């Protein structure tokens, strides 16, 4: 497993813990199908939340959210549709992005976490 995959797994675990502290329930992590992958799927009161986690060393070059372009959003929507066809729910779907800025991609320096709810609007 490469370094970026390890860092990505660390970022997703950190994001899941962040969501739990905000009283979300994690339903799935690393859901994948032939259309793509969704980092986290969680519930928040009336929403089934599909979460894209972006881990960066800093926001100096570009904000992590800028890496979730229209093409990536479309891929996430299609993947979420597949998940919903396999796991029907009465909850409203929502797409969130969690940006994590960690200078060394570890817990040695406290990372900055930003949560954008309904990020694709």
Roles of regions detected by a PLM:
Residues 24, 29-30, 49-52, 114-118:
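Secondary-structure boundary/capping motif
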Residues 57-81:
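Mg2+/Mn2+-dependent nuclease catalytic core
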Residues 38-61, 76:
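Conserved catalytic cores of phosphodiester-cleaving nucleases, focusing on short active-site segments
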């Amino acid at each position: 497993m490469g370094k970026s995959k390890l860092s990505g797994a660390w970022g997703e675990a950190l994001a899941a813990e962040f969501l739990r502290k905000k009283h979300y329930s994690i339903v799935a992590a690393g859901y994948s199908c032939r259309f793509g992958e969704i980092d986290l799927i969680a519930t928040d009161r009336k929403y089934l939340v599909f979460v894209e986690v972006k881990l960066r060393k800093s926001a100096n070059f570009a904000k992590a959210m800028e890496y979730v372009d229209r093409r990536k959003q479309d891929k996430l929507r299609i993947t979420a549709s597949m998940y919903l066809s396999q796991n029907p729910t009465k909850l409203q779907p929502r797409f969130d992005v969690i940006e994590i800025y960690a200078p060394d991609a570890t817990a040695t320096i406290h990372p900055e976490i930003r949560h954008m709810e309904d990020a694709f609007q």
